[in-house]
């Protein structure tokens, strides 16, 4: 269970573009550069929106891109101190300090990713394309990460430069890291 005082900030907004909304226990409304981010805040970026923030305790930088919805969580009270991000839709990039040995957990509708000292990209798509597969794409840019599929309970360990798709139907699809989306579409069609 993630726990933190509702009124204490856990991150600081470092950049915004376009419309970025916040729904939380402490504040609601537009997010601006310099604003604190609180435990439990839901951040919503619009069509042209972008926001980045730095977690105060472990100096992890999180970048949230257009048309995304995330919830920011932190646990400082347990001996397993860590930050969490729940991704409901859209795309995020997480840049962890290589020296940071605390876990960062990203929860998506299809998988739970756990990383430490890693730089990675995650995108959740609920487009129901490719035989009704909704999926989450994980790419490790530097470091290592574990991804567990929520439905199947199976885990995969990823290294630098690897990309994997986790579907809500319980499958993992390994990909070459592509420069365009046609490779993703072709791999998804081959899997079915």
PLM features per residue range, with description:
Residues 4-42, 46-48, 54-192:
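Flexible, surface-exposed loop/linker segments and immediately adjacent secondary-structure boundaries
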């Amino acid at each position: 269970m993630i726990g933190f005082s509702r009124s204490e900030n856990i991150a600081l907004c470092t950049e915004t573009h376009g419309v970025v909304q916040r729904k939380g226990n402490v504040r609601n409304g537009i997010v601006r550069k310099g604003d604190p981010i609180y435990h439990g805040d839901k951040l919503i970026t619009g069509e042209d929106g972008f926001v980045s923030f730095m977690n105060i305790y472990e100096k992890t930088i999180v970048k949230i891109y257009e048309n995304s919805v995330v919830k920011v969580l932190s646990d400082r009270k347990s001996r397993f101190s860590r930050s969490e991000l729940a991704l409901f839709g859209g795309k995020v990039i997480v840049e962890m300090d290589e020296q940071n040995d605390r876990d960062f957990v990203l929860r998506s509708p299809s998988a739970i990713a756990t990383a430490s000292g890693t730089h990675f990209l995650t995108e959740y798509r609920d487009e129901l394309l490719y035989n009704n597969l909704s999926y989450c794409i994980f790419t490790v840019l530097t470091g290592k990460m574990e991804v567990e599929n929520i439905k199947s309970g199976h885990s995969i360990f990823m290294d630098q430069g690897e990309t994997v798709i986790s579907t809500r139907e319980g499958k993992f699809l390994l990909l070459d890291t592509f420069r365009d989306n046609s490779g993703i579409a072709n791999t998804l069609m081959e899997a079915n």
